[in-house]
Amino acid sequence: MEEAKVPMVELGPITFNLTLLAVCIVTILLIFGFVFWASRQMTLKPKGKQTALEYLISFVNGIGEEHLDSHLQKSYSLLLFTIFLFVAVANNLGLFTKLETTSGYNLWTSPTANLAFDLALSLFVTLLVHIEGIRRRGFGAYLKRFATPWPMTPMNLLEEFTNFLSLAIRLFGNIFAGEVVTGLIVQLANYRLYWWPIAFLVNIAWTAFSIFISCIQAFVFTKLTATYLGKKVNESEE
């Protein structure tokens, strides 16, 4: 299968992937639109859209409660909720449609099917976790943890790097593989007309499975974020 081309624009030394930029904006707008719509006209007895929103908030809060001290959980609940929604929506964007120009440029994909994006997202989480650890504990006390006991310092530093790398690669591998298989199913439908009914049924089953996997990956990413954050800010970890 040929590698899809994407439109690029260069601003000085930086090259921007316009498709990736566009789908990231779409992801943000979808999340903002859903939360804005679901939070309008809220009542004491939730129903419909309000129930869905409150369930998502409660679900993500449960992740935070497992890994963060009780007095810290509220401080990071919005962060974890935003990360979960963003990753869940971004994972699923590329499953439902495929947009390509006649010249072969891909105009639609899941942001998380791009390794550079996943590395950037993982770097954001990693930096945020360390910044919060320093803010809560103080710079000296925070650095001391990496040298306690001092023979383990190289292993402690290596662990931080592998956490960053695995967070990105795990997400990329699952979402990219899902889009590749979806593309192969579409090619099967285009190969012969009589393959179309089979490809259609297979695509429905695969899309449903991919949605499930995408949501699981959003859960895993959020849970690992909460785990790494808890190790850095919890008083019980001192």
From Swiss-Prot:
Annotated transmembrane regions: 18-38, 76-96, 114-134, 166-186, 193-213
Keywords, in A-Z order: ATP synthesis, Cell membrane, CF(0), Hydrogen ion transport, Ion transport, Membrane, Transmembrane, Transmembrane helix, Transport
Subcellular location: Cell membrane
One GO CC annotation: plasma membrane
Major place of residence: membrane
Pfam families given in the database record: ATP-synt_A
Top-level taxon: Bacteria
Any single biological process term in GO: proton motive force-driven plasma membrane ATP synthesis
InterPro entries in the cross-refs: ATP_syn_F0_a_bact/chloroplast (IPR045082), ATP_synth_F0_asu (IPR000568), ATP_synth_F0_asu_AS (IPR023011), F0_ATP_A_sf (IPR035908)
Functional note: Key component of the proton channel; it plays a direct role in the translocation of protons across the membrane.
Family per similarity comment: Belongs to the ATPase A chain family.
Subunit structure, as described in the record: F-type ATPases have 2 components, CF(1) - the catalytic core - and CF(0) - the membrane proton channel. CF(1) has five subunits: alpha(3), beta(3), gamma(1), delta(1), epsilon(1). CF(0) has three main subunits: a(1), b(2) and c(9-12). The alpha and beta chains form an alternating ring which encloses part of the gamma chain. CF(1) is attached to CF(0) by a central stalk formed by the gamma and epsilon chains, while a peripheral stalk is formed by the delta and b chains.
UniProt-recorded name of the protein: ATP synthase subunit a
